[in-house]
Amino acid sequence: MKLANWCWLSSTVLATYGFLVVANNETEEIKDEAAQNACRVRLESRGRCEEEGECPYQVNLPPLTIQLPKQFSRIEEVFKEVQNLKEIVNSLKKTCQDCKLQADDSRDPGRNGLLLPGTGAPGETGDNRVRELEGEVNKLSSDLKNAKEEIDVLQGRLEKLNLVNMNNIEQYVDSKVANLTFVVNSLDGKCSSKCPRQEQIQSLPVQQHLIYKDCSEYYTIGKRSSELYRVTPEPRNSSFEVFCDMETMAGGWTVLQARVDGSTNFTRTWQDYKVGFGNLRREFWLGNDKIHLLTKSKDMILRIDLEDFNGIKLYALYDHFYVANEFLKYRLHIGNYNGTAGDALRFSKHYNHDLKFFTTPDRDNDRYPSGNCGLYYSSGWWFDACLSANLNGKYYHQKYRGVRNGIFWGTWPGISEAQPGGYKSSFKEVKMMIRPKHFKP
């Protein structure tokens, strides 16, 4: 596998992965054309290829060095196979069309004022030619069908390989970023003056400061009030406040998002969704960086509570919930569904929010090729192309018309049915919250 550098790789192989590496804002805003053509990120070989064709590679992303799986070299082979098959299919289609035209001309030799060679009128020779052409068409149609089936098989293998490698890269990058953060924080915390002597250290009073990673740990020590608490999911990062639900389903829930009255605008930028916004006691989005730390520290489950203006209350429960870091565009991972509201996050093959990147009106990471779902639906969310769920949509106090840019849950009873006057249903309250999977109240 001949790869010059990461610049070439990002436009070919990683395009088959279904994701693009997010660079930092400074890189994205470089205006100098020469600087844009320069690529500091390099893909390098780590050794000789094995007999099976598996070659070890590494990506140098200063200050990171990422060791890629050996299977990475097979991506290009599969990609080329798919491209070759597509060319064959196109060629077969053209041949089929030519054969059909010839067959039509043979059936009606006088249609264009022409006769078959050596004949003055249709006869046995023409009939034989028609049968031959029909046989060729049938054979080509069969070949075309087989080629399409082979393409489907290769695409399935490619998607499976992409998913395995994506998960491996996510875990590796997460660990590297965490280590770098720890090093930076350690350097920042070094004292400018001389360190105290050993006897001075021993004489200092011992101060105990307990760290709680999430609301479930507060529940474990006896806290029962639904209130604001300070958590530290990862000691190497700063602590922050969260709202804890200590009542729903035995309590211990860390609330990630709440909608209750429309007091907070959710049409926000990438930066806003990154750090969080709103009032933790009313309406808010906790922040993608914080959600990442919370879901990284423990295996979490997700509960979504919804209530419409008719007083109907339903919920959705997912037995796994994880959000990747910003480098991987806050990619969503959800587990199996249970509940009463329906599985809108995995509605169908074309509307599946699992494993999708986060999109905002100013940052398009969705799978819709003709535009930005975040801009069209006025919110930040894990859009597919585009949605079967969007809990960050606009808050409407009643049914509304026009674009379905309000809070939406596609499996809600009657929500997809035609409403008189073209009105669309809205939601009164929504809440997203997480808790450790093995939590025992």
From Swiss-Prot:
Listed CDD domains: FReD (cd00087)
Keyword Secreted: yes
Domain Fibrinogen C-terminal: 206-438
Signal sequence extent: 1-15
Keyword field contains Phosphoprotein: no
PROSITE patterns documented for this protein: FIBRINOGEN_C_1, FIBRINOGEN_C_2
UniProt feature coiled coil, ranges: 73-167
Glycosites: N25, N179, N237, N265, N338
InterPro entries reported in the protein's UniProt record: Fibrinogen-like_C (IPR036056), Fibrinogen_a/b/g_C_1 (IPR014716), Fibrinogen_a/b/g_C_dom (IPR002181), Fibrinogen_C-term_domain (IPR050373), Fibrinogen_CS (IPR020837)
Annotated spans, Disordered: 102-128
Major place of residence: secreted
GO molecular function terms listed in the Swiss-Prot or TrEMBL record: peptidase activator activity
Keywords, in A-Z order: Coiled coil, Disulfide bond, Glycoprotein, Secreted, Signal
Xref: Pfam families: Fibrinogen_C
Location of the protein in the cell: Secreted
Subunit details: Homotetramer; disulfide-linked.
The protein's name: Fibroleukin
